[in-house]
Amino acid sequence: MRERIATAKRVVVKIGSSSLTSDEGGHTVDPNRINTIVNALQARMEAGSDVIVVSSGSVAAGMAPLGLTTRPTDLSMKQAAAAVGQVHLMHQWGRSFARYGRPVGQVLLTAGDAGQRDRARNAQRTIDRLRMLGVIPIVNENDTVATTGVNFGDNDRLAAIVSHLVSADALVLLSDVDGLFDKNPADPTARFISEVRDGNDLKGVLAGDGGKVGTGGMASKVSAARLASRSGVPVLLTSAANIGPALEHAQVGTVFHPKENRLSAWKFWALYAADTAGKIRLDQGATEAVTSGGKSLLAVGITEVIGDFRAGEIVEILGPNGEIIGRGEVNYDSETLMPMLGMKTQELPDDMQRPVVHADYLSNYASRA
């Protein structure tokens, strides 16, 4: 798997805030650190790979110009810092890549962009066109307009979504840790985990929260790595200090193996990125049919419709006790669906005998482990 990452044609590389900012408080973008990273990225591109960068650091980069000594927690102040810092951040990326004659392009995304299929496709096309033009895409979350509860939460998840959007062959997550440990690596008894093949390899792992500068702790990186693996993308998690060997031969850090039964592009998007418009609750029989996979959802197994939605929108699918078991694209609006609940297909009018959610447009969480 490490060889597969080392030779991947299209690579998404995510760099955390702490890997881009100075040691003195982490409040300014460090040109030397960015140059070191770009040197390694250039070497990988010279070896024949396409590289897409997911860069954190806009809020951290805006702290010093605004006279802030601690990362803002107030939403409006965070957005102001991001607005100021993104300019500084892109300036440094541009200067560093210019040493090799490579232009950069800024791509700012929100969770709403990924949540709407047409907007996600537009983002994909933009990134693809930048690559065709020889431009290095620098992707970041648009913190200036993102709102609490409607955002990616951290750029680790954003990197996983971008990996899916661009059909990446590998994702490299860079931070300030050498890889995954079963507890705080400062603990001398901490055990390094070299390979993660499934959820069993993560049993007993304690992942902490984010640090002073960034928002993505180890828990978010593990979550993002597993998210990417569900779309068939192998992931390497390591320190930015190891970026050279990470991109050259991948013999460092922790590797997350991709799932063999990778989700289709639509099902991955529906489960992990799409906006949802409402909910439908199922009885036990329908729940078992959905979670076993391959079955369409029929009206007879639905017990409740929650919220207002239109035909063609994505809804959350709940089990009998309200647990979320999947998502799907509904063929009927909520008003039409209500009187259909519990009815067998043959009891419905001819124009209402389609499945409520066809199996091709139904994705469940049962196989995420």
UniProtKB/Swiss-Prot annotation:
Q: In which pathway does it act?
A: Amino-acid biosynthesis; L-proline biosynthesis; L-glutamate 5-semialdehyde from L-glutamate: step 1/2
One annotated GO molecular function: glutamate 5-kinase activity
Binding of substrate occurs at S56, D143, N155
Q: Which residues does the annotation say bind ATP?
A: K14, S175, D176, T215, G216, G217, M218, A219, S220, K221
- Entry annotated with the keyword rRNA processing: no
Per UniProt, which keywords does this protein have? Answer: Amino-acid biosynthesis, ATP-binding, Cytoplasm, Kinase, Nucleotide-binding, Proline biosynthesis, Transferase
Protein's cellular compartments: Cytoplasm
Q: Mind listing the GO biological process terms from this record?
A: L-proline biosynthetic process
What do the Gene Ontology cellular component annotations say?
A: cytosol
Q: What is its EC number?
A: 2.7.2.11
Reaction catalysed by this chain? Answer: L-glutamate + ATP = L-glutamyl 5-phosphate + ADP
Please indicate which superkingdom the organism of origin belongs to. Answer: Bacteria
Q: Which residues form the PUA domain?
A: 277-351
Q: Which NCBIfam families match?
A: proB
- Family in the record: Belongs to the glutamate 5-kinase family.
Function field: Catalyzes the transfer of a phosphate group to glutamate to form L-glutamate 5-phosphate.
Q: What is this protein called?
A: Glutamate 5-kinase
Originating species: Corynebacterium efficiens (strain DSM 44549 / YS-314 / AJ 12310 / JCM 11189 / NBRC 100395)
